[in-house]
Amino acid sequence: MEFNGKVAIATGAASGMGLLFSQNFAALGGNVVMCDVSEEVLLKSVEEINAKNQGKAIGVLCDVSDYNQVCAVRDRAVEEFGRIDIMVNFAGGTAVRMRQVDTNIYPEFPDVPIDVYDWGIDVNLKGPFYFAHACLKQMRKQNSGLIINIGSITGAEGATLGMDYATSKAGLMYGLTKSLAQYGAPYNVRCVCVSPGPVLTRAAMATMKTLVGRAGEPQEIVDLILFIASSKGQFINGENIMIDGGRNAMGRWK
């Protein structure tokens, strides 16, 4: 696969799968606009990518829940590279974990302060919604593009304490992705959701069961995203693709 001259925006790109995608995309010749709220880590990652890859990376500080900042990322991408070919919404996380909520003090869903869940909905659902709204203006103009949402097995399974995460991911997987694919079709814009099961971005994921008997490697998820974005993946549109080692098929065997 090659992405020479292609332009991607990746949120949550200072670490995890967002960073891994950015590294892969640049290594394959693509230019990438990396967004994150962690400025120091982001700029270091950008510098490392630019030191050893064909493609160019730029870093833009962005809170995905702030629409004005989202539009600024879009504008910077167009100013720097002239177009936006791919938009990948990596930024997200379970609010209770990301906000370091003490579950001994707040043990159940109704006990957790609502502002914690507001953060989760803002980042996990409104963020991708905002980026789609902003980037589609450019993609419509250029009559091409791809939006990739990152869902989760949690969107299909539910989560008693992480309801913000499960609700948001389900919204991406089944509502936003299909709606964007329907809207984008006349403009040659696709939308696909990639929904991982347990992936070894955190040690805790190793204990989750799958039919293949292991958690996924981050590179396996990124490889699927790259395939969808490549010339070989052009017939994939409007779908939520589970990449979960068969976890969603386990049913009562979990």
Predicted segments with their positions:
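Catalytic Tyr-X3-Lys loop
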Residues: 106-129, 144, 148, 172-173, ...
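Alpha-helical segment proximal to the catalytic Tyr-Lys
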Residues: 137, 181-183, 234
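Short, small/polar-rich loop/turn modules that mediate ligand/substrate recognition or access, typified
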Residues: 185-190, 236-238
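Canonical Rossmann dinucleotide-binding motif of NAD(H)/NADP(H)-dependent dehydrogenases/reductases
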Residues: 2-33
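Residue(s) in the substrate-gating loop at a strand-loop-helix junction
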Residues: 152
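A short, exposed helix-loop element centered on a Lys and neighboring polar residues
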Residues: 132-133, 178
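Short C-terminal tail/terminal secondary-structure segment
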Residues: 157, 237-254
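Conserved mid-core segment of classical short-chain dehydrogenase/reductases
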Residues: 94-118, 141, 161-164, 253
